[in-house]
Amino acid sequence: MSMIKNYLVSAWRNMMRSKLYTVINVFCLTVGISSAILTALYLNHELSYDRHHEHQDRIYRIDGVYHVGGNTSHMAITAFALGPALKLEYSEIQEYVRISPIPDMLIQIEDREFLEQGLAFADSTIFDVFTHEFVYGRAMGSLSEPNTAVLTRSLADKFFGDVDPTGSTFDANGQTFLVKAVIEDLPDNSHIRFDGLLSIRSGGNQDAIYSVEPRLFWSISMNYTY
């Protein structure tokens, strides 16, 4: 015990003799430890992305390679018909989902209006591919019909208040949508961001939505495919 005490006394005396070097060393040590802790916290957060999904190790996002004017670009945006085509071609693909973000959508509920930027069209299979916690309603059939919607808790509270909004309706760009379910807000460590989902079957030619034949749906590249 006395030996340890002697070491401590000796170390303290040496520190007092070279105060400037002591301050520099302590500062550098503090910076090093702080940097290591911050780096570990950052890596832990980055590596936690999308780990909340039950099938996270089997989910893949398709990227597109585009050649325009001699330039090659890699983007996550893919053709509308790619999902159905890949499922027909490869038996290993159990399911796919297309998510098409909507830049701006005017929402009307009675005499109130909202300009929302966090909505997206999606296939009903989104809840088979990704895991979400349901507050009201259920996953089955929630987006299978045209003009149906699933809202996050925050958006549902914004539109309808702190009540169960399933069965309620709202108008969006001239169409009326029926709220089928409410899910919890997406966690911060999710690379997919949306406040609400609208059935991808809303509007247009319903038979063509899942077709791989029409040339039009190969030329449209406006969605993410998983």
Provide a role label for each language-model segment:
Residues 7-16:
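A short amphipathic helical element positioned immediately N-terminal to and/or at the very start
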Residues 64-76, 98-125, 135-148, 187-189, ...:
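Short acidic/polar micro-motifs at solvent-exposed secondary-structure junctions
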Residues 15-18, 25, 46, 62, ...:
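Generic structural signal for small/hydrophobic residues in well-ordered secondary structure
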Residues 1-5:
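Feature of multi-pass inner-membrane transport and sensor proteins
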Residues 123-136, 149-226:
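Mid-to-C-terminal secondary-structure elements
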Residues 39-104, 215-225:
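Membrane-proximal extracellular/periplasmic loop immediately following the first transmembrane helix
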Residues 18-45:
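Short, strongly hydrophobic transmembrane alpha-helices
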